[in-house]
């Protein structure tokens, strides 16, 4: 870039016409291309959030009101979602009641479907993702999840929702959210 500027100032005179202007533009474009290529090849590592040991009792509970097939479907969904590394708690809610709790359990046995966060997610049928749950005022809406959960996702499906808790902030990638969405949709189909 410095050579192009020096060439323009000293060698081209006060007014550069035609060929000189085109050559200068090509030189600037080539230089910018090299700079952008170099920047695109820089290996940048994102800093992972600190993993937190979730406080709560470990366990699994399936509602006794479910049929054998529905209980099997609920266990399948929880197992599929728990394959995501950072997911430590899965809570399934369907037809007005909590049908499964698995992993590190929160203090409340039931999903509070009347809380603003859950009722909004169920009404609008759009996932609600809180990547930094400790910074969210609606933290109290997640009593069914461990108190020190770092991230949470509510994924609605027809008649219910899946709620998950993670052990670090910003833990769920778009791919993880898509996987939970597919599992929730299939669970909704099986339970209906």
List each model region and its residues:
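Short regulatory/linker helices and ligand/cofactor-binding micro-motifs at input modules
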Residues: 56-71
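Amphipathic alpha-helical regulatory segments at dimerization interfaces
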Residues: 75-90, 119-124, 143, 186, ...
């Amino acid at each position: 870039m410095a050579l192009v500027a020096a060439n323009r100032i000293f060698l081209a005179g006060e007014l550069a016409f035609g060929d000189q202007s085109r050559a200068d533009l090509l030189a600037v474009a080539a230089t910018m291309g090299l700079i952008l290529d170099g920047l695109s090849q820089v290996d940048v590592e994102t800093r992972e959030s600190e993993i937190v040991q979730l406080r709560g009792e470990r366990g699994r509970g399936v509602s006794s009101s479910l049929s054998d097939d529905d209980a099997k479907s609920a266990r399948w969904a929880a197992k599929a979602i728990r394959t995501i590394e950072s997911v430590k708690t899965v809570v399934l809610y369907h037809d007005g009641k909590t049908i499964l709790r698995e992993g590190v359990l929160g203090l409340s046995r039931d999903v509070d479907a009347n809380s603003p966060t859950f009722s909004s997610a169920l009404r609008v049928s759009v996932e609600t993702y809180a990547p930094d749950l400790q910074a969210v005022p609606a933290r109290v809406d997640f009593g069914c999840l461990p108190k020190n959960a770092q991230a949470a996702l509510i994924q609605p499906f027809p008649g219910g929702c899946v709620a998950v808790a993670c052990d670090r902030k910003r833990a769920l990638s778009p791919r993880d959210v898509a996987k939970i969405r597919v599992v929730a949709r299939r669970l909704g189909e099986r339970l209906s």
